[in-house]
Amino acid sequence: MIDYSYNATVAKARTFYGKRLKEDDYRELLKKTTIPEIAEYLKRNTHFSECLSNIDTASVHRGYLEDILNRETFNEYVRLCNFQKLNEISFFNYRYINNEITVILRCIIYINAGTSEKFIDTISPYLAKHASFDMMKLGEVRTYNDLLDILKKTPYYSIIKDQKPDDNGNYNCTEIDILLKTYYVNWVKEAIKRDFSGSVQKDMLEITGILYDLSNVYNAFRYKAFSGADYEEISHILFPVPSNITKFRFYELMNTNTAEEYIDVLKNTGYGRRMIAENSEISRAS
């Protein structure tokens, strides 16, 4: 069970939190029309200034900027965990597991596209350094079976080993995604139960439940907005967590026909009312 005498780490975490991008920052970023403008704002006005200090913002492209920002936030997390050896507590490996799942899914996408030889260019060494398997070997993968061979000694192997290709030789990335994310959600819950106790455990389980519940609300909206997906289609991409939205309202939400209808129904939920309280512009959206 975790020792709660991590006051120095708590103070450091609060410092990181204080440096986060605020609402005004996001409003300013939304006004930008090019990647160089976004990079320049981040360089001049946010805590990313140091990691962007040697970057020519006038010529930076989106992929490179994303990699720099992702690496910086990941390294901040690693430094925080190393500070008082939180990395020795299993729960704090959650971010590494999430990264591994993301990389595995991306590898399958490249296999489906027939461009697996290019996948090596997308693997970030800073992620590979903290992986539970030899992530750089994924650059040698050419087939799904090659991927399984590398994952054989990991929990991921048994989760995805029985997947079959369709008539075009492609693997169902959506189905694999939800299988791996289901594993991830359950892993986080079990780690919380194992490493925390009492009110802290209760609060952590509640917080993570809300986080995944909101992810479902957001992802369902995206599917509704961009593809007009129905409930049956959306149900396959949802995290397996109870919702704070009533069953009746949740069913109504998932069976809306448009993104506008979705927002109208969402306004009548606890999440929607909270969103309106935080941002009155939402009440006018539909």
Language-model segments: which ranges?
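N-terminal domain-start signal
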Residues: 1-286
